[in-house]
Amino acid sequence: MSDEKELNILSHLTDKPGANQREIAADLEISLGSVNFVIKALIEKGWVKVGNFSKSNEKHRYIYQLTPSGIAAKITLTRHFMSLKQREYQALKAQLEKIEAQGQD
């Protein structure tokens, strides 16, 4: 399981707390099976808790909420992901500058 999928699902749960797994899968363009697998892992880690919609006729629907440790994990994953993307950006920028310099010779 990738940190990126975990971060994307944690972010989605923050942005759309009432979303079900199908909606998450559709919004993130990943398989329903992947969403189910990641959410189960997040629950096992204690980052997400599950509840029912108490004021809904759809008692079988679940609501996924980030726990305090889930919020902390989201912050850590976001920092890690930003650092990774920053390094990728710098590497691509250096590569582009090198190609441009070669083209000017």
Label each residue range with its predicted role:
Residues 73-105:
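Amphipathic alpha-helical dimerization/coiled-coil segments
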